[in-house]
Amino acid sequence: MADAKSTIAKDVTELIGNTPLVYLNRVVDGCVARVAAKLEMMEPCSSVKDRIGYSMISDAENKGLITPGESVLIEPTSGNTGIGLAFIAAAKGYRLIICMPASMSLERRTILRAFGAELVLTDPARGMKGAVQKAEEIKAKTPNSYILQQFENPANPKIHYETTGPEIWRGSGGKIDALVSGIGTGGTVTGAGKYLKEQNPNIKLYGVEPVESAILSGGKPGPHKIQGIGAGFIPGVLDVNLLDEVIQVSSEESIETAKLLALKEGLLVGISSGAAAAAAIRIAKRPENAGKLIVAVFPSFGERYLSTVLFESVKRETENMVFEP
């Protein structure tokens, strides 16, 4: 009897991508369009940023810019890109220094340290700009160091053009009418959006940003609670000309929607997934979208947010529980 072909991955990097799509069923009352979620929480390290962690490191290696065991990698991040880099740095043997605003969840810090990354916290009042500046300072005094620069690095949207976009197109059987994606670096909406519009120019692209920091809508940067989107500046990798519309969602609505996704859909997701879902539901209620298919990208898994406002009430409740005799 012939041996069955082995499907064992050679290492953890081969597990990235090919995440599933699932319809939302119980949070879509009043919607005239169908809403499906692209579950990036099913990546090996539970976020969409696993894709760019891999693509940015591979790209720099292929260009001869970094070498495992020799180069020191540095990156400013709101957390998930740091984790996406950290598990690959661990698998390949890189030293990694992460600069992150102190306002990001405790889970992020713990996971980064578990992968052996060094962590430098920056002033939360200065947002991502403060983390970027700190990374530059560290690079200046660290020999053989390299900043991957997710906000400027073309390898970021490129991986979404090559993988995320085609996966959504195939997964929807070419039936997608609109893509909804929160904008952090803008890599997902730019790369996947460009691919999808090449397949069908009528596909609409919706970016999502916090109402409290609505830069893309001409507003001012400000503090908000939607970790991972709304960096407070327009990233270099974002192609704003691709966007058909930018939807603003408040931190409160994002948090409430994320809670509902757990309670009604069985999907434990992060706050930015709540923002994407809230925007997608809003779009799906517009009469002109009757019968259409809207795909929302859910960037990360809820377990990474247990220490945040998202789970504050249930956490308090569980901490105060006593056993029954």
Swiss-Prot record:
Coiled coil: none annotated. GO terms for cellular component: cytoplasm. Pyridoxal 5'-phosphate binds at residues 80, 184-188, 272. It is found in: Cytoplasm. Its EC number is 2.5.1.47, 2.5.1.51, 4.2.1.50, 2.5.1.52. It catalyses: O-acetyl-L-serine + hydrogen sulfide = L-cysteine + acetate; pyrazole + O-acetyl-L-serine = 3-(pyrazol-1-yl)-L-alanine + acetate + H(+); pyrazole + L-serine = 3-(pyrazol-1-yl)-L-alanine + H2O; 3,4-dihydroxypyridine + O-acetyl-L-serine = 3-(3,4-dihydroxypyridin-1-yl)-L-alanine + acetate + H(+). Keywords: Amino-acid biosynthesis, Cysteine biosynthesis, Cytoplasm, Lyase, Pyridoxal phosphate, Transferase. Produces L-cysteine from O-acetyl-L-serine and hydrogen sulfide. Can also use pyrazole and 3,4-dihydroxypyridine instead of the hydrogen sulfide to produce two plant specific non-protein amino acids beta-pyrazolylalanine and L-mimosine. Homodimer. This is Cysteine synthase. It comes from Citrullus lanatus (Watermelon).
